Amino acid sequence: DRINIAYTGERTVFRFGRQAISWGNGLLFTPMDIFNPFDPAAVDKEYKTGDNMFYAQYLQNNGNDVQAVAVVRRNLMNGDVEMDESSLAVKYHGFWGTNEYDLLLAEHYGERVLGLAASTDFGGAIWRGDLVWTDTDDGSIFSAVAGLGYSWVIARHNWNGFLEYYYNGFGQSDSDYSAAGLAANPELLQRLARGELFNIGRHYLGTSLTVELTPLLSFTPNIFINLITIFSSFGSRAGGIFKH
């Protein structure tokens, strides 16, 4: 269900049509992936829903590259093409020694978005992180993800696991997830409706462990924890204990 026209040169790539891209270093939570991100709880991530877009890439001699994306959308109310419904983004990917980094500049649904991502080796493990700033009608909002991943071999089976902390700047600052509480957070509701966000809280911890049972079969349990709910429950129980 994807049709696009592509040109690939020695250092340049141009594509126009239905396609999918993934940006950022988050494995479960992806604040920098502003175009059709995966639900963190998605089981099958082999196929990603795409957008009708223009994509361009320029590869430098040192391995760094620049990517640009333009997505034109219509206003669902009047059917007109509008800049406030469209997206234009440029991302620079570079190497600094053994480290990698990304710089993002975008105009997304009429809002300016800046992003910084980095990954590096940390004692044999891989550290990854994204920091994203969005200039909304309600002011500046930051979102971030940081994670640590490690791979090893036990009993001739390949294992890998990672731990991620996610700060969702658009999420509820407290544990009020009622309809009235969510209605007071239109920035969150807009992103939920557009399929850009899947979490309504603010602080999350996610972890995953994969074991390769056979070359064609692997087992991957994931755990997601809403830290606000956990701490609120702990505080209530502790308060009840100390009160008596």
Question: Where are the predicted features?
Answer:
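Residues that define the transmembrane beta-barrel architecture of outer-membrane proteins
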Residues: 1, 8, 48-52, 84-88, ...
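Outer-membrane beta-barrel translocator domains and adjoining extracellular loop/strand segments
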Residues: 27-33, 78-84, 113-116, 139-145, ...
